[in-house]
């Protein structure tokens, strides 16, 4: 069975967004070692899951980057745009973008159906409420939390209840980001 791997930027005090979803706290000064790690993580996946609320910005950003061949993110952007994306939504039937389809079915059944299909692992990016739902329903097999060197005091969280985790790896980078990889217990 394929694994569902959560990837999220997070603050040292556990927030994935400011009170209104602000992301101005994120560290974008990524060194080559961190970019290489992100590329390695991406190679193990062939499908992206997204919550509807973050999809528009995600698609718009990566589809713009692939028009900029000199961008340091160009190679990664090609992977993001080329990979099939499944967007979970209760309200929208169609979303514009390359390799995008919308899933309106019940979350647990739809995710388990995707996980049972042949292929590489599945990577999931936010938003906060979508990630929280996946965690609460015990659908996540691995968490890659990119801990940014900042505390914001309040904001959006992905953990709404006690969630025991086992640390698999923890690696620090020159940008101050520490990537903690966990498995749910």
Residue locations for each model-derived region?
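Enzymes that bind and transform nitrogen-containing heteroaromatic metabolites
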Residues: 1-185
